[in-house]
Curated annotation (Swiss-Prot):
UniProt record similarity statement: Belongs to the MutH family.
Main location group: cytoplasm
Cited NCBIfam families: mutH_TIGR (TIGR02248), PRK05070.1 (NF003458)
Organism: Shewanella baltica (strain OS155 / ATCC BAA-1091)
Annotated gene: mutH
Domain of life: Bacteria
Keywords: Cytoplasm, DNA damage, DNA repair, Endonuclease, Hydrolase, Nuclease
Keyword Membrane carried by entry: no
Protein name per UniProt: DNA mismatch repair protein MutH
């Protein structure tokens, strides 16, 4: 399987993304010599990884933007027949300890969401995985209002983490950004701050964008 060379510049990345629009996942997988999973229950990240590979993303699982040299994060987003997002969008792992001095401006969430290339993909379960088509890509930068909402949610969530209240945070917290358990395996544990300021063990958490927020982004472009 040939590794795709990363795009040299933003126009090249956008050209590659636009060339995928209307193409099925099976067609792209065949070009790369990959087999298509029957369903995504055990291969939840397969679609995203396939798109990353086809576009030449560089980050892998590293905590940086997928196209660091272009300042662009790549996000595939499963949509229904009306163009609405079907699930929340994972942003990054949330820090639960050693957070002194961490601000919104130097946070990984802020870094990852500076500029995002959204790639919509048909996601309704009745469509076989290989037959799902890729949609028109959207290059998005948060406007001042969106940035304010993101920062506000992030700061409120991080304040509760700092106070040792991570267990009290539910997916309902936050207007556009939420905190949820990250690990597929509930036995996975990481250190977090306890209410008395000591460290305790808890399940890893991740930051996710709510569907109401990503629907707003898609609506701005597709109406």
């Amino acid at each position: 399987m040939n590794r795709i060379i990363p795009p040299e510049n933003l126009p090249e990345l956008l050209e590659r993304a636009h060339m995928m629009a209307g193409v099925s996942l099976a067609q792209i997988a065949a070009q790369r010599g990959l087999s298509v999973p029957k369903d995504l229950k055990r291969d939840k990240g397969w679609v995203g990884q396939l798109i990353e590979m086809e576009l030449g993303a560089t980050a892998g699982s590293k905590p940086e933007q997928d196209f660091l040299h272009l300042g662009v994060e790549l996000k595939t987003i499963p949509i229904d027949s009306q163009g609405r997002p079907l699930e929340t969008t994972y942003v990054c792992v949330a820090p639960l300890s050693n957070i002194q001095g961490l601000t919104w401006q130097n946070s990984l969430v802020s870094h990852k969401l500076q500029r995002v290339l959204w790639v919509p993909v048909e996601g309704e379960r009745h469509i076989p995985v290989g037959e799902r088509r890729i949609g028109t890509p959207i290059l998005w930068e948060p406007d001042p209002q969106e940035l304010q909402l993101l920062q506000q949610d992030w700061e409120e969530i991080m304040e509760l983490i700092a106070l040792g209240k991570v267990e009290k945070l539910t997916a309902r917290h936050g207007e556009v950004l939420q905190l949820r358990p990250k690990a597929a395996n509930s036995k996975a544990l990481t250190q977090s701050i306890a209410e008395d300021g000591s460290l305790k063990m808890t399940n890893p958490r991740g930051f996710y964008l709510k569907t109401s927020f990503t629907a707003m982004i898609l609506n701005k472009v597709f109406g």
